Amino acid sequence: MPLFLYMVLLVLGIHCVQPNISEGKVTSCLSPQQNATLHKMSSINADFAFNLYRRFAVETPDQNIFFSPVSISAALAMLSFGACSSTQTQILESLGYNLTEMPMAEIQQGFQHLICSLNFPKKELELQMGNALFIEKQLKPLAKFLDDVKNLYETEVFSTDFSNVSAAQQELNSHVERQTKGKIVGLIPDLKPNTIMVLVNYICFKAQWANPFDPSKTEEGSSFLVDKTTTVQVPMMHQMEQYYHLVDTELNCTVLQMDYSKNALALFVLPNEGQMEWVEGAMSSKILKKWNRLLQKGWIDLFVPKFSMSATYDLGDILLKMGIQDAFADNADFSGLTKDNGLKLSNAAHKAVLNIGEKGTEAIPEVTFLNQPKITLLHPIIQFDRSFLLLILEKSTRSILFLGKVVDPTEA
């Protein structure tokens, strides 16, 4: 009889409960500037993000895309801890890691520092990534696995009676609801029979723009071109401010960097008309490094839609196509997790939610806007009134927290 393992990944670009972080845990986190492994991993993780994005683009053409690459990478890396032989190799290779070039211990240490760095308390930036593992109370997980996921991945582990499906479902959904402060309710509507383990991963993010938009200047009913024949009306935020930006003539797109007030930034990428597929196919860690080098600051007359976006994905088929095959098969080897036979991955779900507004993401304390003298000089206009790409990055680790495409900002 097969025993099923769920992997559920939650992503919230909104407020969530912050767990207590001890001083010892914080001070043990190495600075990313001192961690060569973490910098090496940032490129690998970015390329995984774009490869996964392209899979989503094929599976859901002409639709909004939104997900958290770093949370998926961290969850898969944690799962690889309990995998052995080809099951482990396939998971790590799908993430872009070569065990002959970077040993398992270095990979795990790198993810430990990554999670620690992301969870490091920052003033005016709320960012927290967490994991929870719900294990059937009759299952005998290995002590080393439990210690490793607790210490390296800051994972909470719960002993759960999955024989009582409704009670187990309630326990899991209640935990998720608490951790996301009620933003995700009833995440798992129906647990499969014989489920023995559920892995939940979430990342929560709230931040204020370094230069918030004045709500009084938001223009209601502005046109946004979805495709050649479809136009929708959206609230369009407007600001004249200095931003880092560039025109990439090789990729046929305009790139705008909007900083959050502390240690995070958003990249808005506007392909020239008809060039979205070209830009999507070219995105890579090298492109990000090129943009970071070439971005220049200057005055911009900026128009950005105000919108909310969410997306839910069944990652099973996509992960299979990316090379993670044994983990879903009867010959899956999770002997690093338990000596019990027959454990395999049954499902991997991912949900992401984002709110973009005048002040940043989600609710931020009120901001006072001072009257500014009218500027009579003409400045370049950048207007995001058609499909564009959106990346949100954490600065110190250069991690892609969120990656997406806005095709129709009216589809929440």
Swiss-Prot record:
Keyword Membrane annotated: no
Top-rank taxon, per record: Eukaryota
UniProt xrefs under SMART domains: SERPIN
Disulfide-linked positions: none
Residues annotated as binding thyroxine: N292, K395
GO MF, one annotated term: serine-type endopeptidase inhibitor activity
Signal peptide: 1-16
One Pfam family from the record: Serpin
SUPFAM superfamilies listed in its UniProt record: Serpins
Residues glycosylated per entry: N20, N35, N98, N164, N252
Family matches, as InterPro entries: Serpin_CS, Serpin_dom, Serpin_fam, Serpin_sf, Serpin_sf_1, Serpin_sf_2
A Gene Ontology cellular-component term: extracellular space
Function comment: Major thyroid hormone transport protein in serum.
Name the UniProt record assigns to this protein: Thyroxine-binding globulin
The gene coding this protein: SERPINA7
